[in-house]
Each structure stands twice: as structure tokens, then as C-alpha cells.
């Protein structure tokens, strides 16, 4: 059926929760030649603020490196008014590199777990009142590592949240346009099929929001999109596009 919210812009809907994911590319814009002090935190923060998520998973964040001698997630938190929760994945250029979450309300607890990769990877779980939100950035080189990453997260949920009945969401850059079939036995994609990695000769969808189906949660997707805004050209802010999902509260 047609989505009744299509064509209405991306304003927040009444009685809804907005989840999002965004690979920030170190806030450096869309080009691939990284370097020092190229970051534009105002641009990245503007996209996040226009999206107005309740919680957003962010990938590729420097913290006090030689490239960016600041806490990039804190820079975004300062500009958006959201709460930052950082998850270091590797030591990098004299500092840290990793993923994070920005949220409007503080989570009850957080947990960081290890995932496989030629470059070390993590999943970062945050429990809120109405749901669990897991941010991640999977290995970019190996289908096997990505499949194992799904297994590790699923096993962690089964071991630690067996009695949990609320929705559990997974959001991030999964670095593949084809998710492992085995993973889709426990997870359902609820985000848009639009391409998210586009400044390339072969655009693809590699950024997702999924819901865990193992606990048969009650949820209702109202809308999902790769948003665009008149106020800023999202194509130039990162080499990825942001993804949002609106759910009934």
C-alpha cells in the first residue's frame, strides 16, 4: 500500500519515535582525500538537527587524533543539544576512532561488544525506556566477518535479554548491499531501500535500521527515508547519506 506520509517532507509525526543512522566520514564532506582540519561540524550537525532523531547511530568519529584534535562526537552534541555516548573501536593517529550515539534522553545503560574485522569493530547497545538501540559499523572486507557480527549480536541478545519483550533495533553502516540470509532469520530490515552510499560509480544501500524478530516485538513503521533538505545539500556533507525511520510510540 502507498505510504500516507510520502510527499509530506520529513517533519516529525505525532506520537512517534525517530531512529536514524549516519556515517559521518569524520565530518569531512564527501570527498575521499582525508586530512587535518577538514571537518565541518556545523554541516554534519545541521543534517542531524534537521532530522531531529530521538536517537541516532553515528560512524567514523575521531577523538583527539592528529587529524582532528577534538572529540568529534562532543562537537556534534554541542551543536545539536543531544547527549553523546562514544564507543572507541581502535586507537588511531594518536587518539581514538570509533562509533557513537546521540540521543535526546539518557539511556538506562550501555554496553560495547567486540565484533570481528581486519580493523577491530564493535557494537554499542543502549537501553531506553521503550526499546533497545544498537549502533554498529561492520567490517568492510569480509562477508564472513559480517555474518559472524550478526551472530555475535544475536547471541548477546539471546543471552542477556531473553525475557525482553520490547523492540530491539540495530542501526549502522553494515558495509554490504546484501545482508546474510541467516541474519534475516532473526532480523528484519525496516529502513528504506534507497541507496545510502552514492558518491561512487556504483551507488548502493549499505546503511540500515533493522528490528530483532526473535522476541516477536510489537512495532509499527510509519515512515522511512533518506531525507533531503532545502537548507543543506546532504550529498556533500558525508560520503554516506543519513537514514531515518519513524515508528509509532
Question: Predicted segments — roles?
Answer:
Residues 3-10, 60-132, 138, 220-227, ...:
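Structured beta-strand-rich core segments of catalytic domains in phosphoester-bond hydrolases
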Residues 12, 102-105, 125-130, 212-213, ...:
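Active-site beta-strand termini and strand-to-loop segments that position acidic
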Residues 15-20, 96-98, 120-122, 129, ...:
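Residues that flank catalytic or metal-binding motifs in active/ligand-binding sites
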Residues 36-44, 86, 199, 228-231:
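N-terminal post-signal-peptidase region of extra-cytosolic proteins
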Residues 1-7, 112, 144, 158-169, ...:
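Metal-dependent phosphoester-hydrolase catalytic domains
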Residues 27-33, 111-114, 137-146:
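Surface-exposed cleft-lining segments at the edges of enzyme active sites
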Residues 1-79, 91-95, 239, 248-249:
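N-terminal, active-site-proximal structural segment of metallo-dependent hydrolase catalytic domains
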Residues 18-24, 44-69, 133-136, 152-183, ...:
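Active-site beta-strand/loop signature of hydrolases that rely on acidic residues for catalysis
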Amino acid at each position: 500500500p502507498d505510504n500516507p506520509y510520502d510527499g509530506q517532507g520529513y517533519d516529525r509525526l505525532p506520537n512517534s519515535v525517530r531512529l536514524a543512522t549516519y556515517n559521518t566520514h569524520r565530518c569531512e564532506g564527501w570527498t575521499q582525500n582525508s586530512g587535518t582540519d577538514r571537518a565541518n561540524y556545523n554541516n554534519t550537525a545541521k543534517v542531524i538537527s534537521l532530522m531531529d532523531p530521538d536517537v541516532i547511530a553515528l560512524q567514523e568519529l575521531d577523538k583527539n587524533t592528529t587529524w582532528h584534535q577534538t572529540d568529534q562526537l562532543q562537537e556534534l552534541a554541542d551543536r545539536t543539544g543531544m547527549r553523546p555516548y562514544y564507543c572507541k573501536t581502535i586507537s588511531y593517529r594518536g587518539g581514538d576512532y570509533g562509533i557513537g550515539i546521540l540521543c535526546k534522553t539518557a539511556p538506562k545503560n550501555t554496553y560495547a561488544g567486540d565484533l570481528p574485522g581486519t580493523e577491530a569493530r564493535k557494537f554499542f547497545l543502549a537501553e531506553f525506556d521503550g526499546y533497545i538501540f544498537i549502533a554498529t559499523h561492520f567490517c568492510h572486507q569480509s562477508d564472513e566477518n559480517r555474518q559472524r557480527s550478526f551472530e555475535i549480536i544475536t547471541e548477546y541478545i539471546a543471552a542477556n535479554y531473553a525475557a525482553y519483550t520490547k523492540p530491539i533495533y540495530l542501526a549502522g553502516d553494515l558495509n554490504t548491499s546484501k545482508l546474510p540470509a541467516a541474519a534475516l532469520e532473526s532480523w528484519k530490515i525496516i529502513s528504506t531501500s534507497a541507496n545510502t552510499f552514492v558518491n561512487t560509480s556504483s551507488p548502493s544501500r549499505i546503511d540500515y535500521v533493522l528490528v530483532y524478530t526473535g522476541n516477536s516485538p510489537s512495532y509499527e513503521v510509519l515512515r522511512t527515508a533518506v531525507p533531503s533538505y532545502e537548507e543543506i545539500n546532504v550529498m556533500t556533507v558525508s560520503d554516506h547519506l543519513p537514514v531515518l525511520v519513524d515508528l509509532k510510540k
